[in-house]
């Protein structure tokens, strides 16, 4: 009995080790089509097209006449049916726009941390006054970039169709006017295969 149990456990261990997962690196720019859900290819495509649209816009030429305008990027609202990390989309767009050399940015997501550090420098008595950052010297944003990511999903059991739409806006903070807006769209489809004998 013990011998049979040991033999069964040995066979089970051998089978379990044969089902191990292989991990490998892939090209981050390669098209990813594992599912119709939002993925890395969608992030790269939407952000790349949107950034190029803003860079090529006559509005960008107009607001850049007196130098690189200062922007802050508000969070992109996820209005899709999926849990999507819109912060990754926001970060990617901000990075690409900054690399373009056409814009400067302030990071509103870190205001509380910056304020805490400045207060520490001013009030703690621990910071050398010669190296202390003075209050009231930060650059203010002139424009706000913000948007929404929405989706429409249709599924009839055989075909699943997913449509994504990213809408972005650039607002002049002085006047409240929209100086630029664009939409980029992606449609993905999956079909269930039927067995053919």
Across the structure, where does each feature detected by a protein language model lie?
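N-terminal leader/capping segments at the start of a protein or of a new domain
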Residues: 25-60
């Amino acid at each position: 009995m013990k011998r049979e149990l040991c033999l069964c456990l040995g066979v089970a261990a051998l089978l379990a080790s044969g089902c191990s997962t292989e991990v490998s690196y892939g090209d981050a720019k390669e098209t990813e089509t594992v599912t119709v859900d939002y993925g890395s290819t969608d992030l790269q495509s939407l952000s790349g097209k949107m950034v190029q649209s803003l860079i090529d816009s006559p509005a960008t030429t107009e607001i850049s006449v007196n130098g690189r305008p200062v922007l802050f990027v508000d969070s992109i609202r996820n209005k899709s049916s999926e849990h999507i990390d819109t912060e990754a989309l926001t970060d990617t767009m901000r990075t690409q726009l900054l690399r373009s050399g056409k814009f400067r940015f302030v990071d509103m997501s870190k205001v509380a941390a910056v304020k805490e550090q400045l207060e520490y420098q001013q009030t703690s008595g621990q910071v050398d006054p010669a190296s202390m950052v003075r209050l009231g010297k930060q650059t203010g944003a002139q424009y706000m970039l913000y948007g929404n990511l929405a989706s429409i999903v249709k599924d009839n059991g055989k075909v699943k169709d997913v449509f994504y739409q990213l809408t972005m806006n650039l607002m002049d903070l002085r006047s409240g006017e929209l100086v630029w807006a664009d939409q980029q769209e992606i449609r993905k489809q999956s079909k269930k295969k039927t067995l053919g004998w």
